[in-house]
Amino acid sequence: MDIFKVLSRGIKAQPKKNQPGAPQLLPSAGAKVNPQFFHDNVGGANAKRGKKRKRKGAQANNATESGDEDDDASDVDYFAPKPTPEELAAKKDAELKADEPKKQKPKLLEENECRQILKSHRLKFTVLAGRVPQDEAATEEKPPKKQKKQKEDRKKQEEEEKKKKKKDEDKKQIYPQPLNSFGELKYTYGIHPVLADNITRQGFRVPTEVQMGSLPLQLRPEMALEKATDVEDVKVEKGIDFLGVAPTGSGKTISFLIPAIDAIIKRRAEDYTPETDEHVLQAIVVAPTRELASQIVNEGRKLAIGTGVRVVLMKRTLRLVAESNEQEETEQEAKEEVQDSDSDSEAESEPEEVMKIDEEEEEEEESDSDAEKKTESRAKGDQKFKKERPITRVDILVTTPKILLNFLCGGEKEKGKPRIIKKTLPTVQSLILDEADVLLDPIFRKQTMGIWRACTHPNLGMTCWSATMASNIEALLTKHIDKRAKRTPEQTPKPLIRLVVGLKDTAVPNITHKLIYTATEPGKLLALRQLLHPVSSADSGPPLRPPFLVFTQTIERAQALHDELKYDIPLEAGGSARVAVLHSSLPDSVRSKIMARFRSGEVWVLITTDVLARGVDFAGVNGVVNYDVPVSAAAYVHRAGRTGRAGREGGVAVTFYTKDDIPFVKSVANVIAMSEKQAGKDIDEKDTVKAAQGSVQKWLLDALPKVAKEDKRKLKVRGVESRRTGGKATITTKSSWERRRENNRREAIEASKRRKREAQKAQKEGGAAPEKAEEEWTGLD
């Protein structure tokens, strides 16, 4: 018998929600000390670490020296006067110098140690293409064994061996050196000291998984593979082509900017003469949206402070140093490129998210500043003005595909004619594709391939980055890299190395996923209002707190949802200014202001389409709401990746689905299940504790129907069809009578305008005065 229960039987227990508890972790609380997603214990030499033992003599002295930093942390003078700005600056410089280890010969890890570290962080390197075949004479040294089997069995065995050998040769796994800290970049991998100081000032200490694996291979591939065995056929003297597949928010932008800036600094130091130009275009970064391109430019300029490297965003008024291309060769290449794109697409249709991104790019180009519009209008009437426009000196160019291709082709595309590349960029030695799966999708593929063909440097390096990468995109990259290598047979082909972090095409494991059934469209609106105004703590999992993003399927639905929610936040908390909508039909200046307000915390709820689903970094977003089910598993991965950036914990991704969504929601449920498996929340129907931790349980996965291939294709192209036609799927709280009244009035006004236009047209054609029309109906009052 529990005596406490007996004595407290008549006392009402205090609710749990009022009891003080541990503070909740949120992405908006600040950066995490360790931004890494994975760190498994794989045993081996590192398994014995952490056991304390007594030390004597020199060992004790070494231990004392290594623990100085920990002792200093507890030696704090709480009554010291406030330091002056000069003292703060001197202290900061001293900390920077203290972080620099003494320059010494780099110590490389053995392959077994590299294998354990890479495995603990779930890093997998694979050589996809570019391996040099070994001499056949060396492989045929051993005499063939006598076989007493029939010819048919021998042929079958040989065919199986060839298939197995070809499969092993096509994809070979390697174990390069990992990057344990950013301090190794300066002395081990020899990056420029100014660049290393900029990295330290930006607060980078512990590398993420993608930075740990990709930076050594990109900076010094020979050193990264020095201790690796069985890599004789992987020739990296001329560099490598790289394909990085890593979770959202894992630092992919820094992973390709650091090697690009460092390579430009080194080439400038080697080739510098007083006659040469200081700024030569050597690297191009291609991104699908203008917001993402602007973000990359900002990050690049922070890293390039004091290095002399210029990072510029491409605009229509920009002039670059380019060479003219021969017309015949370009037409032939354009035809080949069109045929390759048609054959590689395999009757694939454009995903809705890509179509929206393309629409956004066109809107951005059309909605440039007034000064640029005046410049363009003057340039149309005065060809001399175009020639007098100065050439922009740039080292790294960040651009969207269409605007750069228009510059290379000399104008907009004409209908029915293939794009003719009139200019080439022979100085570009590095082409970087951010969100490569979108840029190589059918709708962007021709533009991206045109830029790729315009970069004619024989030693061009290619790097591609994304959180999702389909196998057909990898095959397309391999095919075109091999084709480009065959054009220069005198050079050793660069190997194409792929890095996969964690499980491929899965969402980030450090956030909570929720799949909520709302039955109908009005149920979605009610559920979203409950998230804005939580009334009960009965719901399992962490609550969703602002700021957060709300994704819808179409622009019309985003605008309608904004009209419904803009008065839901009380005036004391900021009112309608706390809710905003952003989509591709808004002008560029308006979108920039909304983005700035959301980053500064003025906007708490940002309603948008898939335009903001990729690449854009919002460090403090606490959650994501998929008001409409994503059109694909990849779309869900990128939407959910707007929270939980850089390892921040506490983010929430909520997905609403109705009865109409049940045939399509299984792909999203599978992604959530795989993400929870990475986080250790394995689905187990026998273990009720594990089942309670996961948001997608075993019975739900079994009950949801499988999505057919044709349904997936239709969903990518059009989304859920009922939401495009309106009707019952309209986002509104108005009654059907009110909506019918508004529609009748709108149609009556349109009919009145149409009759007036017809009357004016008849008057112009006939010349006679029109008869007096009957009194027009103006609709219901």
Swiss-Prot record:
Residues annotated as binding ATP are 246-253
Q: Where is the composition biased (Basic residues)?
A: 48-57
Q: Name one GO cellular component term.
A: nucleolus
Short motif (Q motif): ranges: 184-212
Which intervals of the chain are annotated as region Disordered? 7-108, 134-177, 323-386, 718-781
Keywords per UniProt = ATP-binding, Hydrolase, Nucleotide-binding, Nucleus, Ribosome biogenesis, RNA-binding, rRNA processing
Superkingdom of the organism of origin: Eukaryota
Catalyzes what?
ATP + H2O = ADP + phosphate + H(+)
- Enzyme Commission number, as recorded: 3.6.4.13
Helicase C-terminal domain mapped to chain residues: 527-689
The region annotated as signal peptide is: none
Task: Look up the record and give one Gene Ontology term from the biological process aspect.
Answer: maturation of SSU-rRNA
Span(s) of short sequence motif DEAD box: 434-437
Mark out the compositionally biased spans (Acidic residues). Answer: 66-75, 339-369
Domain Helicase ATP-binding residues, every copy: 233-487
Check the record and name the Gene3D superfamilies matching this protein: P-loop containing nucleotide triphosphate hydrolases
Q: Where in the cell is it found?
A: Nucleus, Nucleolus
Protein task: ATP-dependent RNA helicase involved in 40S ribosomal subunit biogenesis. Required for the processing and cleavage of 35S pre-rRNA at sites A0, A1, and A2, leading to mature 18S rRNA.
Assembly, in brief, is: Interacts with the U3 snoRNA and is associated with the 90S and 40S pre-ribosomes.
According to the UniProt entry, the note on domains is: The Q motif is unique to and characteristic of the DEAD box family of RNA helicases and controls ATP binding and hydrolysis.
Q: Hey, which family's this protein in?
A: Belongs to the DEAD box helicase family. DDX52/ROK1 subfamily.
Q: How is this protein named in the record?
A: ATP-dependent RNA helicase rok1
* Species lineage: Eukaryota, Fungi, Dikarya, Ascomycota, Pezizomycotina
